[in-house]
């Protein structure tokens, strides 16, 4: 028999440990999905207590798991490092594996709602150079870096648009205030919170390029969504984005805002030369293909 834990369960994992060990004693193979280990790597990115709770979860699952199955090769590598750093006392090191998540965007049931001025907005930006960021505004997502870089571009006379779709998250009060002020005072910056799937779909179809600026991710679903919509990608040069997008994206040095400025200008130059990478070249999977890959990892 196989037991597969598909989601993070911080609140009850310690109480469940005796049950899991008894299941294992009776011959059940225990596997846990790992989406990332970022709270262990960067506790400063999370609200108080979350990193400690995650550390407790990680300690238990590495004590009892036969397998830890990660959602990318990059996460698997991170887990391997954390197993060494935390020197977990287990009866045997869990077997590590990885697979990729799927995406069947056309077969989802999207939320439908457009603001009254949506047609005017998209009709305007579709003819302008517009970069799109998708995801909750939180410390690791790179919104501060993007705002710094685009502010520099605007000061230097470039009129590129930056569109952010994503609600305010945690530990970003000052950044959110800055973004709100910028959206009111700068005609090239737009921040939409609570946007519907229909609005996001229009954004993917109307913008010029997806800007993926995160410092770290477990996978990077917006890159896959961009590929489905044939939207070019400019991504921070991190391992998981290289893994997901390969040669189907341009990459920038995210160590400073100047690196992003250089990346944006390089992307624009290559766009003018019709030399940007083709986003449809990403290796994407359906959810059925992803499920089959997961079953392969379980060796069922």
What positions do the PLM features span?
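Carbohydrate transferase catalytic cores enriched for Leloir-type hexosyltransferases
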Residues: 1-300
């Amino acid at each position: 028999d196989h037991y597969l834990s598909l989601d993070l369960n911080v609140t009850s994992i310690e109480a469940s440990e005796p049950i899991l060990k008894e299941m294992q004693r009776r011959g059940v193979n225990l596997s846990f999905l790992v989406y990332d280990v970022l709270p262990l790597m960067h506790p400063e990115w999370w609200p108080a207590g979350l990193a400690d709770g995650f550390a407790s979860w990680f300690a238990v699952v590495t004590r009892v798991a036969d397998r830890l199955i990660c959602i990318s090769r990059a996460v698997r590598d991170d887990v391997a490092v954390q197993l060494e750093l935390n020197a977990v006392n287990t009866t045997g090191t869990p077997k590590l594996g990885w697979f990729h998540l799927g995406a069947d965007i056309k077969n989802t049931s999207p939320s439908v709602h457009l603001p009254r001025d949506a047609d005017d907005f998209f009709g305007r930006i579709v003819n302008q150079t517009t970069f799109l960021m998708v995801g909750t505004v939180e410390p690791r997502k790179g919104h501060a870096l993007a705002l710094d870089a685009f502010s520099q571009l605007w000061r230097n006379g470039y009129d590129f648009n930056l569109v952010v779709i994503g609600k305010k998250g945690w530990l970003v009060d000052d950044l959110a205030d800055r973004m709100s002020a910028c959206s009111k005072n700068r005609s090239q910056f737009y921040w939409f919170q609570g946007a519907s799937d229909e609005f996001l779909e229009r954004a993917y179809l109307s913008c010029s390029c997806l800007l993926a600026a995160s410092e770290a991710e477990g996978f990077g679903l917006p890159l896959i969504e961009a590929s489905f919509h044939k939207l070019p990608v400019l991504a921070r040069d991190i391992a998981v984005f290289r893994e997901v997008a390969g040669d189907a994206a341009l990459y920038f040095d995210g160590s400073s805002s100047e690196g992003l400025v250089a990346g944006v200008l390089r992307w624009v130059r290559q766009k003018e030369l019709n030399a940007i990478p083709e986003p449809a070249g990403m290796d994407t999977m359906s959810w059925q293909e992803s499920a089959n890959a997961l079953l392969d990892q379980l060796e069922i």
